Amino acid sequence: MITKTIISAITLSGCLLANAEASGCPDQYPDGVVPVVRNPPASWNNLIELCAPHGGFVDGYSPVLRVPLYAVEHLTREHIIEHQRNHEGRTDSFRPDDRLTHDQRAELGDYKRSGYDRGHMAPDADSWDEASEYDTFVLSNMVPQAPDNNRELHAHIEGAVRHLAKQDGELYVYTGPVFQGDTQYLHRRVAIPSGIFKLVYDPRTHEASAYLENNVNGPQGQTYTVITPARLTELTGIDFLPGIQTKPLDLPVPRDSGSFGHSRKHGFF
């Protein structure tokens, strides 16, 4: 059973997440608006904000579940172009987050021989240089992800969102886990999500929609639906765009070919 974790100390690089005034990296959120946890289990209280040292993303991290409940990126055309110009191949640097205590964080051993990938929430491919890429490899930016989903559909969704950001100029992208039913754990420590979401908000048009995927192997791990921010709040208990009025965003259909169509489907997971 999960019990509430008491956080006794907060470092300069991680703070209890309560409001925009408390944020250590307000520029990562649209208009500085921090997500609000509306209806969580008691054990989800005390999310820790973990700002990437070199910018680019911020994680809202649960020291109880030992996964981020979301990662937020301010994804820009300039960053994508810089990545394409500078990237010379991925260098894996998976490591525990030393901003957290052992009791609060996931360790490499938690994932060993688990059958799950260490799935990035803020993707390494969204980084623009070696330092920002290195930032993405802390385990506080990971969830246990089914390999078929992580390496195929989810990767294609990431690519589709980059394509849209390059086309539109800038987006705010929220990625995280969904927990439905009885939650399973790696070594009784790291929560395994039943699904993965990626919410995309265009600040220019005030449009937003989310991809929702099954976190499983096989054909079910290759299916997704598109939902509204309100439906995502129902599923996660988190209001990602509090006070922001949005219209549906026409999300691109993820494809492995590099060419992206568009989907106007808005269904439910």
What are these regions (language model features)?
Residues L16-F269:
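Domain-level detector for secreted/extracellular nuclease and nuclease-toxin modules, and
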Residues K4-C15:
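Bacterial N-terminal signal peptides
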